[in-house]
């Protein structure tokens, strides 16, 4: 059995640790921070808002929040990070000053009205391009009043932006979503003294009576990153893999559960539970069968491109529905997946809210064809999850990806670990 500590710290927790430190009054410590481009954007923005950041060890920082958030003299650059833009919008909506949030071309084409509308319900002064649909966003911090909001979409980023505004509003605010989304924001903030009550999926958020407590967080490995290597094991005959020190929050392992339903052998062993459950995941190859994914989409939407690779190896027709949000990620991920599969000659089709893929079960004829004829270049669309998903497919087919460097957005170690997997041995350090 191959043992792997992927050393890819959780992206969601890394973002939140930095952003939440700005609502504390004393120095906070973040250990095992994800040094991916997205999370570094959040860290740089914190510095531009007045936080002092000091290296304490490898991938670890002491963050001293400012006495009051500073009005920056320049645009706050979120680069490719939707989490940075959406969560900072919630945080800054009640802070004194003028703030402009912008990003790269991809981020500035992603939907922002989904956060602008709930923030305006508080009375926030926030504007976006093209009738509030897109960034850049301009925020003039102002006093907020509590509100009730029912979100039409299940999104941890929308929920988190709302919660960060609610903590700074006058009165108790209520948030309801149509499907459970990731709950790291609630867990972390409650541990730091925020009063957030969850009753049957409805959040009631009281304003902060005092600054958040200072914290010392050590961040576990990201299950979304670990999933790529669970997928690699599932499609590689005779493979057995132990993924170590992985965050096992129930809202984050839905993709592993889907792979398990497809036939892969997957077992969780909890090693600790402090703030969040952390443990090991055992994965073993087995023949895969088709799956229909139509529920709990918010809990696995980031992993659907990777799951599409598993679907290629499954017996039967697999289906994804109710996943329209895939079209407004870093790329149109429905189009990206299906256009690449069609270029490879795979039977598949896209819908408005998903796709189907007819599994090959036996991929050897396709491999033989590409050994005789050069296969088409796989297009990443500069989307890290598309690039990494199809990079896993290179374990079985002789394919090339047009831009695997974009994996650095969330998983800087990916290329090195993939090469080690191909060799059959790991040293995750």
From Swiss-Prot:
Keywords recorded for this protein, A-Z: Amino-acid biosynthesis, Aromatic amino acid biosynthesis, Cytoplasm, Transferase
Pathway the protein contributes to: Metabolic intermediate biosynthesis; chorismate biosynthesis; chorismate from D-erythrose 4-phosphate and phosphoenolpyruvate: step 6/7
Protein EC: 2.5.1.19
Keyword Glycoprotein: no
Stored InterPro entries: Enolpyruvate_Tfrase_dom, Enolpyruvate_Tfrase_sf, EPSP_synthase, EPSP_synthase_CS, RNA3'P_cycl/enolpyr_Trfase_a/b
Positions annotated as active site in the UniProt record: 302 (proton acceptor)
Residues holding 3-phosphoshikimate: 11-12, 16, 155, 157, 302, 329
Chain sites annotated for binding phosphoenolpyruvate: 11, 82, 110, 157, 333, 385
PROSITE patterns given in the database record: EPSP_SYNTHASE_1, EPSP_SYNTHASE_2
CDD domains linked to this entry: EPSP_synthase
GO cellular component: cytoplasm
SUPFAM superfamilies: EPT/RTPC-like
Enzyme class: transferase
Any one Gene Ontology BP term: aromatic amino acid family biosynthetic process
Catalysed transformations (reactions): 3-phosphoshikimate + phosphoenolpyruvate = 5-O-(1-carboxyvinyl)-3-phosphoshikimate + phosphate
Function: Catalyzes the transfer of the enolpyruvyl moiety of phosphoenolpyruvate (PEP) to the 5-hydroxyl of shikimate-3-phosphate (S3P) to produce enolpyruvyl shikimate-3-phosphate and inorganic phosphate.
Family: Belongs to the EPSP synthase family.
Assembly and oligomerization: Monomer.
Name of the protein: 3-phosphoshikimate 1-carboxyvinyltransferase
Lineage: Bacteria, Pseudomonadati, Campylobacterota, Epsilonproteobacteria, Campylobacterales
